[in-house]
Amino acid sequence: MQGRLSAWLVKHELVHRSLGFDYQGIETLQIKPEDWYSIAVISYVYGYNYLRSQCAYDIAPGGLLASVYHLTRIQYGVDQPEEVCIKVFAPRRNPRIPSVFWIWKSADFQERESYDMLGISYDNHPRLKRILMPESWIGWPLRKDYIAPNFYEIQDAH
C-alpha cells in the first residue's frame, strides 16, 4: 500500500522508500540527503504547504542521524488535511542535509535546534548557529555517544 505522495513520486520516477504507515494512517518516507531538496520543492508544489514540525534524532551510538519533517497539505474546505512524514538519514561523520528554510520558513528555528543538539548541518540555511547552547559549547548534547563535560554550576545558596 502506498500513500498519495509516494504513488506520485513513483509515477514520476523520484527515488524514495516507503517506511509504512503510523497508527493515524500517515505514511513515512525515507529520502536520501542528495534528493531531499528537489523532493521538498516537489512536495510543496504538490500541495504540502505547511511544515508542521521538524526534529532530529540519533538512531544509535555510531549510527546514522535522522532529520524528520512532518508536512501537511492544507486546503480550503478539507476537514482531514493530508499529511506525510519524511525522514532524511545522514552519516554521523559529516551530517549534511539541504535546508528547506527557503521553502517553509517555519524550518528556521527547528533546523537550528537540530544543528545545535545533534550537529546536523543544514546547507544554505541563512542563520545556522547554536540556538540553545552557548556558541562556545563543544559537542552535540543529544548524540548518544556524547560525553558530558565535568563541571558543576555554582548556584546561589539563598
From Swiss-Prot:
Keywords: Chloroplast, Membrane, NAD, NADP, Plastid, Plastoquinone, Quinone, Thylakoid, Translocase, Transport. One of its GO terms (biological process) is photosynthesis, light reaction. It is a peripheral membrane protein. Gene3D superfamilies: NADH:ubiquinone oxidoreductase, 30kDa subunit. The keyword Methyltransferase does not apply. GO terms for cellular component: chloroplast thylakoid membrane. PROSITE patterns: COMPLEX1_30K. It catalyses: a plastoquinone + NADH + (n+1) H(+)(in) = a plastoquinol + NAD(+) + n H(+)(out); a plastoquinone + NADPH + (n+1) H(+)(in) = a plastoquinol + NADP(+) + n H(+)(out). Its main location: plastid. It is found in: Plastid, Chloroplast thylakoid membrane. The keyword Manganese does not apply. Its EC number is 7.1.1.-. One of its GO terms (molecular function) is quinone binding. Pfam families: Complex1_30kDa. NDH is composed of at least 16 different subunits, 5 of which are encoded in the nucleus. NDH shuttles electrons from NAD(P)H:plastoquinone, via FMN and iron-sulfur (Fe-S) centers, to quinones in the photosynthetic chain and possibly in a chloroplast respiratory chain. The immediate electron acceptor for the enzyme in this species is believed to be plastoquinone. Couples the redox reaction to proton translocation, and thus conserves the redox energy in a proton gradient. Belongs to the complex I 30 kDa subunit family. This is NAD(P)H-quinone oxidoreductase subunit J, chloroplastic. It comes from Chloranthus spicatus.
